[in-house]
Amino acid sequence: MSGFASQIPSMALLGSGLTGEVGLRVLFSPLSSNIVLRTACCSIGIGLPVYSTFKAIESGDENEQQKMLIYWAAYGSFSLVEVFTDKIISWFPLYYHVKFAFLVWLQLPTVEGSKQIYNNQIRPFLLRHQARVDQLVDGVYGEMVKVVRSHQGEIRFVRAMIAKILGSVNEDAPRLGEIANGSPVSETNSDSESDSNHED
């Protein structure tokens, strides 16, 4: 294995025999729960590719950048299909095992599953329906612009509230730091108010 994949230890491990053996044991272990497999699917499907994409962008290697774009096109298509089918097929035994194996297959440098899916499924489909997809995307974008323009007041209000919340958090942070360091806390309005209440 050469090139970019060998520079990332986790990608190099995907093609090694040790990882294959451990992976198969995890995949077919009856003790593995869906929570473990969901976490593994998220790590393999998103976490590792995010880092690989970062490395491809930082290195400036156009071949690696194209490889990651193809991966994200394949993963995005899979996620789109999964949104509509997950509730039905997740009940099948070993669903998350198969999903995990599929996500590993998409990234294996030796087989380049994402490239196979892109070249054999995604690209031909999008080339055939490009005009309709462009119309749909333009329509959705136009509607989004209308919604944003018609709700400018609400958007400004939400932005102001977020800024106010973040501002109050930033103001409280130094006082909390003083308390944590054992510094004396200066008298606040609530202390003086409690004193005036005792006088009554």
From Swiss-Prot:
InterPro entries: TB2_DP1_HVA22. Residues 176-200 are annotated as: Disordered. Pfam families: TB2_DP1_HVA22. It comes from the Eukaryota. PANTHER family: HVA22-LIKE PROTEIN K, HVA22-LIKE PROTEINS. Belongs to the DP1 family. This is HVA22-like protein k. It comes from Arabidopsis thaliana (Mouse-ear cress). The gene is HVA22K.
